[in-house]
A protein has these predicted regions:
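Generic secondary-structure boundary/loop-capping signal
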Residues: 18, 158-160
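Iron-sulfur cluster-binding cysteine motifs and their immediate structural context
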Residues: 98, 108-128, 139-156
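Generic anion/oxyanion-binding catalytic loop in active/binding sites
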Residues: 41, 92, 123
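Active-site-proximal loop/hinge segments that shape catalytic or ion-binding/gating pockets
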Residues: 161-166
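A mid-sequence, solvent-exposed acidic-amphipathic segment
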Residues: 73-106, 110-111
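Short hydrophobic "strand-cap" motifs at the C-terminus of beta-strands
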Residues: 131
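FMN-binding flavodoxin-like domain, especially the glycine-rich phosphate-binding loop
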Residues: 1-85
Length: 168
């Protein structure tokens, strides 16, 4: 929390409280990372569902000074050292590739991009804009119904995850 507050203060943002939810794993951009197995995914979603109501009550009651965050192993190392490697070398759209034979031009990948870093080319195929705004969130990858999007060789054989409201 201390590092988070410091970073926010540098950006001119005052942090009064901090609450986090542990959600299913969706980052698949490194060789040793994949989506959670179904039982872990369901367990995390059930836990988040229980915590979310409590968090909503805290927010609605305007409670200040709340700190309920999940801190992983080696937070300083992960945040400062590995975080800088991610920011400078891994968070990019240059590794994304489209398999045009699999693509059905549905546009789900384009619509799912939270930073509007994709558009359709003149043939209707999705393309990355290479503007430096890509978050490497993999929303495009996870929302593709035909698995036409790949991140180099790093996503070969890996799972997909995205939340659907009625998913059990």
């Amino acid at each position: 929390m201390k590092m988070f507050k410091q970073d926010c203060e540098k950006a001119g943002i005052k942090v009064d409280s901090c609450i986090s939810l542990l959600m299913p794993e969706s980052y698949v951009g490194l060789p040793f990372m994949d989506v959670d197995k179904k039982e872990n995914e369901l367990r995390k979603k059930e836990q988040a569902k229980r915590e979310l109501q409590d968090f909503a009550d805290t927010i609605m009651k305007n409670v200040h000074g709340t700190e309920r965050i999940h801190i992983g192993n080696w937070p300083r190392t992960n945040t400062r050292f590995l975080g800088n490697i991610f920011l400078n070398h891994i968070i990019t759209d240059k590794h994304f590739r489209l398999n045009e034979e699999k693509c059905i031009k549905c546009g789900r990948c384009i619509k799912s991009c939270p930073v509007a870093n994709m558009s359709a080319d003149s043939n209707g195929f999705p393309q990355w804009l290479h503007t430096g705004s890509c978050l490497s969130c993999f929303a495009c990858y996870h929302h593709c119904p035909t698995r036409a999007i790949e991140f180099g060789m790093r996503t070969k054989g890996k799972g997909q995850y995205y939340y659907t409201k009625n998913e059990k």
